Amino acid sequence: MKQKTHKGTAKRIKVTGSGKLRRERAYRRHLLEGKPSTRTRRLKGTTDVSAADNKRMKRLLGKA
């Protein structure tokens, strides 16, 4: 049976050309009034998926 891509993971994680996994940072969706602007600025942009989670994420994406 073919391995299916986990769609929830596919919507959240992008694979770069070199094969690295990128994700958005958490804590920047709502309730931003109480958070300092320095914190929301720091949470801007994307970051790499941690090395501990890399193998699992690639398996969910069907890239393993």
Swiss-Prot record:
InterPro entries membership: Ribosomal_bL35 (IPR001706), Ribosomal_bL35-like (IPR021137), Ribosomal_bL35_sf (IPR037229)
Record NCBIfam families: rpmI_bact
UniProt name for this protein: Large ribosomal subunit protein bL35
Gene Ontology CC entries for this record: cytosolic large ribosomal subunit
Superkingdom classification of source: Bacteria
Pfam families assigned: Ribosomal_L35p
Species of the source: Corynebacterium urealyticum (strain ATCC 43042 / DSM 7109)
Matching PANTHER family: 54S RIBOSOMAL PROTEIN BL35M, LARGE RIBOSOMAL SUBUNIT PROTEIN BL35M
Keyword Ribonucleoprotein carried by entry: yes
Single biological process term from Gene Ontology: translation
GO MF annotations, alphabetized: structural constituent of ribosome
Region (Disordered): 1-20
Keyword terms: Ribonucleoprotein, Ribosomal protein
Family in the record: Belongs to the bacterial ribosomal protein bL35 family.
